[in-house]
């Protein structure tokens, strides 16, 4: 019987153990997509307690707690921090088989150093007190944890109207060497069908000093904000394409669509598709000219529980996987961006694992001459950010493309404790390659495969995003 979560956790062959301990383990972290609040990094935030750093805002944990019958007041409500932590501690033993069980104990181990102890009601007091004592120390501040975890770069997720003042503050601080750069997330300028669109256009017009009436005005406003983001070191965009649409339109049609929406009219699905296509093609060309990377996160079905959405708002654990087709529309969109050779470096993520092979083959259609891995099939995202999901994604990428050129893992997280997801990914990667070697499906060449592992863990992302590190 193998003990739970030793130093060789998941490393079930000798070759996997060599790959992980000698090549993967000590690689720095290049976290190119996350949802950390830049203000907390700028202020070097000190966490009040274990709830503050670990459960606050974590919809993964809230979903599990609700499934375990926990009352909403103990998830998102007015219960005390300790009551919420105790509710989580009571839920953890029921999460065996869920990635939360592994994540929880990896996060207790690093950075808190808690090993050989499982979170449950009987250990809750001890773990709460031990972690809170550590959180009072300087090296457990927001920046301290990032430094402990050997982070070199993080890309936050930022709206085009954001001032980026916190990024500027971080950049000016010569004592802090981790790159914290904004990522451009223009969903609110793109989702013309949303009730909030007109208010957002007013805000975008205000910050860009542009009166947005025609499509060209929107392009002008977005270009000004792209320049603002570029001045703060941005090299990455991110789009939530819950449904991939494609429909072409001329400028007069786009002007009419925008004018009708600004007048409060409801658009047809075809008109929405025309507008969204035009925005994505325009932005893709801007990214290509600037040398940016665009990310498309495809296939979320959001805010399913309308009653809870009205009470609690978005992003609190009521989203799931969509099953809308994507292949034809995505192909047309990428081909349109590529017509004038203005398809930027692109990472495609799917939420429905049914679409893994769709993306795995789609990227091969648009690879760039002289640019290894220009088009990327992104790491297992959200509901696929677990052992089976990561194995499936990497296996299919290897079979349909080049695993060796993969830019690897990202946390996509709101928590400063999520960096152990990189460790989890690295262990799974080494386990997978070790099994190939054990089965005689890959050569037992430690130099060849060790270098490949190092590249996937860090070097490929560093080179792909072309961000100069400190």
From Swiss-Prot:
Annotated catalysed reactions: D-glucuronate = D-fructuronate; aldehydo-D-galacturonate = keto-D-tagaturonate
Sample GO molecular function, one term: glucuronate isomerase activity
Enzyme class (EC, first level): isomerase
Family, as annotated: Belongs to the metallo-dependent hydrolases superfamily. Uronate isomerase family.
Keywords: Isomerase
EC number, UniProt record: 5.3.1.12
Associated pathway: Carbohydrate metabolism; pentose and glucuronate interconversion
Organism: Escherichia coli O17:K52:H18 (strain UMN026 / ExPEC)
Biological processes annotated in GO: D-galacturonate catabolic process; D-glucuronate catabolic process
Superkingdom in the source lineage: Bacteria
Protein's name according to its UniProt entry: Uronate isomerase
